[in-house]
Amino acid sequence: MTGLLVRNLESYSRLAELGFSEKCVLDHSLYTWNDEAIHFWKNQKILRNTVPLELNEKELRHRENAGSEVIVYGRLPLMHSAQCVRKNTTGCNRQEDRLVLKDRYDKEFPVVCYCHPWKTGNTKPEGPCYNIIYNSLPYGLLKEADKVKALGVSAVRLSFTIESAGQTQQILEDFVAAYREGRVSREYEFTKGHFKRGAE
């Protein structure tokens, strides 16, 4: 095991108590927007932090990125919901499934249902379900490889969630070609998130 991806303070606190601070990689959900926050986490002896998704390229150039990794591909969650889409439409069948929500523009938003108690921390036989609703387009910085590398990050991350094995392999190969060889051979429809415009 080379690292543990940590998404909240509670998880970090527990891992630190167990002596795993130096294996912790903070996800983008933990605050590292400025150098003061980065230095705080360095003092905790974490392995790395993740570049905030809300900062744009210009803002990232002014951030200390040497101990950071950046997400260059992934389906980003739009919402975590305790209101199960399946339960509220056709009824819960306790099957972990994928659904699709369509908006008025016919954009499809993948929904993943999580139904098993061990995943929700509930030990009752019928625990609460929850859903993750993902953006209609994956986040991707394929053509921005040179700009990403110029930020001086220590690693790039591809975050696979709902992709098939074949899609995962193809995307991985294309990103390796772009980031190692500077070659983009395939067109994808990606959102760039805040990389170009930033959060307001």
Feature-to-residue mapping (PLM):
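Active-site pocket-lining/capping segments in soluble small-molecule metabolic enzymes
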Residues: 1-200
